[in-house]
């Protein structure tokens, strides 16, 4: 094999798309997928490539340094794409220690295993850390409506400011604080030891295989089962959305051509207020299910806002386009159509993961709001 790449969290939402892309695009690479298989990790996400000769799955915890040391030695790993993380803000508010353990100590353990194994022989090595735009804090909502596309109140900017690679960190949730800390550790390992590193910060992803604690698959599933659609506060918060396969393509480009020790922002230039996004989802699901227009609108239920709910995230990814030629390939309207169709056509996948522990979590999060 030409290279051996360790991808952590490869059974999760974004990770499974990255694993699939690398396994199929680079048959001369050996791809080692390390995943703990927590509630959000699902090997069914990779059923189509699990028998590929250049793919290996290893179950393990990134906080287990001894296991990581053995893994680097066993597979002679020369590149890391680190996606394994706890990522849901609501869960971080309820259980910040788990987020600190996985996102901070797990990243540190992985860095240390790589540093020890590579032992200063940095040529051909790379530690690529995937992070979030939430580390930057929040932006002001200075335009009540975005530059509407097709009459929708979404798609265009809701303010003058955007997160750039120079934006100072100002995390507001335990989740974003844990990711900010892990980002700093990655950069510190470059500055202190000379390890070749890269960090990227991405906006909200959507698409197939996303665990239904996140807004889009949650609401598709709730509409299907005629359950309430819980909207935090008035639903005025704004997020920038990127189709997950476009994110995977960006990771590929940056891993192979990015400048060592640099940071790249990955975004969709595609801002939507939560309430407007939800209405698009409602209309799309109703249309694809053959429901009369407006059937599911009445399921929208405003609930108590999340503590410390940031108003607006918006990524400026022009550096990535300018230096490496990447830009999103999918417009939001096309992406949300593909996404809704996928979940409706893969109801068994959804049913399999929305049982047991997930149902208990869902009730604990929303029953009293």
Named regions from a protein language model:
Residues 171-178, 208, 212, 216, ...:
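The catalytic Tyr-centered alpha-helix of NAD(P)H-dependent dehydrogenases
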Residues 15, 42, 92, 208-212, ...:
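Alpha-helix N-cap/helix-start motif
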Residues 2-6, 31, 60-63, 147, ...:
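C-terminal substrate-binding subdomain of Rossmann-fold SDR/epimerase-dehydratase oxidoreductases
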Residues 36, 179, 214, 319-321:
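A general lysine-centric signal
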Residues 1-205, 255, 338, 343-346, ...:
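N-terminal Rossmann-like NAD(P)+-binding domain of SDR-like oxidoreductases, especially those catalyzing
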Residues 43-46, 139-143, 210-213, 277-279, ...:
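Short aromatic-enriched loop/helix-cap "lid" or pocket-rim segments at secondary-structure transitions
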Residues 18, 139-140, 210, 215, ...:
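Acidic donor-diphosphate engagement hotspot in glycosyltransferases and nucleotidyltransferases
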């Amino acid at each position: 094999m030409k290279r051996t790449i360790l991808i952590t969290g490869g059974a999760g939402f974004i990770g499974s798309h990255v694993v699939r892309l690398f396994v199929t695009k680079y048959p001369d690479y050996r791809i080692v997928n390390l995943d703990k298989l927590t509630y959000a990790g699902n090997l069914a996400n990779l059923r189509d490539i699990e028998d590929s000769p250049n793919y290996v799955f290893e179950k393990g915890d990134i906080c287990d340094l001894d296991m990581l040391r053995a893994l680097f030695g066993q597979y002679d790993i020369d590149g890391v794409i680190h996606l394994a993380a706890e990522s849901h803000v609501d869960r971080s508010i309820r259980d910040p220690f788990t987020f600190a353990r996985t996102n901070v100590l797990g990243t540190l353990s992985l860095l240390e295993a790589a540093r020890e194994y590579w032992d200063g022989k940095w040529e051909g090595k790379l530690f690529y850390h995937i992070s979030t735009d939430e580390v930057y804090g929040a932006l002001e909502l200075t335009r009540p409506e975005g530059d509407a596309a097709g009459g929708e109140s979404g798609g265009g900017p809701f303010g003058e400011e955007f997160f750039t690679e120079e934006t100072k960190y100002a995390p507001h949730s335990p989740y974003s604080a844990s990711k900010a800390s892990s980002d700093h550790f990655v950069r510190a390992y470059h500055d202190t030891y000379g390890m070749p590193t890269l960090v990227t910060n991405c906006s909200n992803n959507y698409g197939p295989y996303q665990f239904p604690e996140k807004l889009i698959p949650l609401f598709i599933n709730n509409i299907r089962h005629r359950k309430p659609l819980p909207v935090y506060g008035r639903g005025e918060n704004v997020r920038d959305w990127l189709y997950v396969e476009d994110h995977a393509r960006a990771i590929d480009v940056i891993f192979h051509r990015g400048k060592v020790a640099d940071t790249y922002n990955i975004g969709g230039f595609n801002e939507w207020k939560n309430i407007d996004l939800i209405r698009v989802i409602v209309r799309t699901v109703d249309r694809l299910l053959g429901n009369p227009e407006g059937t599911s609108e009445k399921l929208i239920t405003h609930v108590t806002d999340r503590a410390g709910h940031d108003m607006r995230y918006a990524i400026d990814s022009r550096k990535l386009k300018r230096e490496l030629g990447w830009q999103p390939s999918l417009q939001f309207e096309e992406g949300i159509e593909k996404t809704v169709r996928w979940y409706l056509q893969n109801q068994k996948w959804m049913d399999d993961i929305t049982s047991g522990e997930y149902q208990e979590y869902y009730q604990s999060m929303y029953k009293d709001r």
